[in-house]
Amino acid sequence: MPSCLSCLVPGQTRRRDEDDGSKKILETPLHPDAVVPPDNVSAGEFIFEILRAKPTHVGQIDSLTDAEDTYGQMLERSVRTALWLRSRGIESGDVVALCTHNHFDTVTPILASLYCGSTAAPWDPGMNCQEIKHMVRISRPRYVFCNEESACTVLVALKECKNDAEVVVFGYHSGCASFADILKPFTAEEIDEFECSKIDERSEVALIVCSSGSTGLPKGVEHTHRTIMIQFGIVKLLNLRNRTSAVFSSLYWISGVMGVLVCIAGDMRKVIVPVVDEDICARVIEKYRITWALMGTSVLVRLIYSGALEKYDVSSLKTITGGGGVVSLEAFAKLRAILPNALITLGYGMTELGGAATFQLVECEQNSCGKPIYGVSCKILDTSTGGILGAGEVGEICWKSPCVMKGYRNNPEETADIIDAEGWLHSGDIGYYDKDGSIYIVDRSKEMIKCRGNQIAPAELEGIIARHPGVQDCAVVGKPDKIDVERPVAFVVRRGNSTTVTEDEIVQLVASQVSERKQLRGGVRFLDALPVSPSGKPKRAVLRNMLLKEI
């Protein structure tokens, strides 16, 4: 069986000399002993061989029922699903969408898609119809696997988009194929003789994962089979083989889908947690003696401050991997007091980078997000001149990585905006690195609000509020919050200074139009006028400062 699990190994970040003699580009090269992912092996072939080699290994445990799922069972169901897809005429490039909660078969259509050389597109089951319609337009799926709760919304969205994708339901829904039924028609001989499709693993798109756009609607980020294979290196990097794991993240996020696949690559026992709640998470860690937990930093911070980690015995945790936001020094200290011997790896990542770009493998400088992982380079650009800056100088952070996305799905313009001609990805984040190569984030040049691990675009909420007849002007910004990172707050100017528009009215208006994760959790503030720039744009920094004074 081919191995790529040591492509990320400990080593030394260095600064590369530029023409003027200064060392301005951070890079962490591959270790000489690293095993580079093999050519001509797809992620589907790699996972298929792992599952086939250990049929009795318990790969999944349902935390609700204690039921166990072996690699052999996972392989059979995923092969049966792949055979069904082939019987329906699936081809390379076809999209298999997934819209469901976490359960044994959440990963099955993804594995089947990888075997067939097609493209898997996980969607958030909490999306409303407008959001799913947007995903349909981006990914243009040929097949959609969804749970019973999402079926009606998915069917309406497909119909309104004039998309005739076949819908398969985990459970039952009138007019749709049942997942249990599509597994039945195939013989043991067909399963034994199954082979994965041969593809070009460097160019074929394996995943379309959502990333927030400046309008609030997500973009479809394309990643190849090669990206998945390289990300499997985290098993070696963090010594995760044969761990008992829990992925407290939806497959909608890059961390969730990569985390689930990494669990298979590392021969782990993954405990499935259908609902991410602080008390449930801590109870699962205690009951199943979880040794590796992967979660967004928003979940981690809520766990720390909820008291759940003290309520349950979580001493089994050897490694916690978190990303997607900042963990304050206060929160980190509380976590370290609870788990003094655990390896806490917090890092910086982007969906467009295929996951993590940095990791703190040791206690780095305070507030640092760590150093570039292997094969990743970083430079800081002056936001005015575009020139490369040195250590301690603040500018836009740019990245080069073997895991950088192929592009945004059906969106070459925005792809060209974020990846330049030399292959550098412009993150939109503002920061610097110190003399030791540790990277610090100081601001976001984007206006996105980060709340509970979700990216919320002010423009989307502002567009909804502005449609209220009693609203003359509005702006939405994030208010810093110890638990949620930020909470969206709407600043509203009433039309004609009318007093008839209430906070509850605005909050309910937004709630009726967007998903639960985009609510105005910070409330509404009424002003006589918004502070604006000479061009008429809201001065968001001024509004944020007003909120800071409330803290």
Regions found by a protein language model. Name each.
Residues 170, 515-537:
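AMP-binding/adenylate-forming catalytic domain of the ANL superfamily
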Residues 68-72, 206-232:
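Conserved AMP-binding A3 loop
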Residues 2-16, 87-88, 115-185, 496-499:
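Structural core segment of the AMP-binding/adenylate-forming
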